[in-house]
Amino acid sequence: MKTVQIEIPKGFKVESFDEVNGLLKFAPLPKDIKERVKTLDDAISALGASDKDVVDYRVMQSLGLQDHVLGNQELVIITKALNEGWVPDWGNGEWDKWFNWFYGGSSSSGRFSFLSSDNLRSTSTCGSRLCFKSKDLAEYAANQFFDTYKKTFTI
């Protein structure tokens, strides 16, 4: 038996090996969602044009709705894309749910903190569509999409 060592290219994994013809296929390693979603357009691409929230957003755009209304739908799309299919289970107090909450003396302030729920009690000051599955994603969204939050939640 002959052994051949093949170096797997960085950023790839072995997808398949055909023993008949010796063909080795590589596939790119999936990138972290934070690397894939950096803009609203990235979030829309991640969900796909036929996603109901994306379709609703396009309709809302065509109606010429105010920026803060469109901004809310943009946050729904961004949150949904970053959560990668995770939907909060409000009946499960074991799961933490993260929501961005901004504090400030004026509408231009940029301080924020993060809230979660636990199994002893639940505090909810947000709609479930804007909850994240991790603190890391909530912090990322708050920083990366701060302008979208600002236009949605301030006058």
Q: Which residue stretches match the model-derived regions?
A:
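Short, compact, well-ordered microdomains
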Residues: 116-155
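Negatively charged, low-complexity tracts enriched in Asp/Glu with abundant Ser/Thr
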Residues: 36-90
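Short, low-complexity, charged amphipathic interaction modules
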Residues: 1-34
